[in-house]
Amino acid sequence: HLMRGDSYLLNLCVSTPVETNLTLRHLFRFARAPYRMLLGPDARISGVHGRGCVCFSPEPFVTVRGRSISTFPMKGTVPSATQEARRWLETDEKENRESATIVDLMRNDLSMVATGVRVKRYRYISPVETSKGPILQCSSEISGLLPENWRSRLGEILLKLLPAGSVTGAPKEATCRAIAEAEDMERGFYTGIFGFFNGRDLDSAVSIRFMEEDERGMVYKSGGGITVMSRMEEEYQEAVAKVYVPFDF
């Protein structure tokens, strides 16, 4: 699909078996993350895949304050927090093109629901502490202005923006078809969104950094962006870097 030009950025996800004595509730309790989610009172929802899951996401999806809506696509991860790693993330051609593709996609998506859409911050780098040591992640911020009646149309607005571009790719529709062919797992709640709306403002996050439990045991779902410029070893190391739990005991 990439070589034919059906997609020029495809976010491919994999499932990694995990062995641990901790329950999903323990993982939720001790994980450090801006956004955390535990499904169900006992981490299970009856009738929905029969699974329990926990998410400790560093990536906002959209936030709304007043009428201002912002989205923060995260693209680019390096398993180190050294100056050398930062320079690589800032200058690598593949990482730069990947960011540009997703920022353009999300700018177009946001323009379907908001006016005055602009890129406020482009490719800012943030450290993330993990149980394996720090990693660096690259994000951008895109903002616009919602209509006065956005609260009564919140569901419609979110549906127009989904699925999140940072976990699918571009062009979105063709890439989603390619993902369905390529992946040998069911994503389920992984790469969806979750959040909180208090009647005035909205906070939401992309369901990444995600562990799931079923009758076979526990798995960690992770992934990354693939392009025609991808180098196999670098993509593998990025996927490994994302299999972590940001614990705080």
Regions found by a protein language model. Give the residues of each.
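Extended alpha-helical targeting/anchoring segments
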Residues: H1-F249
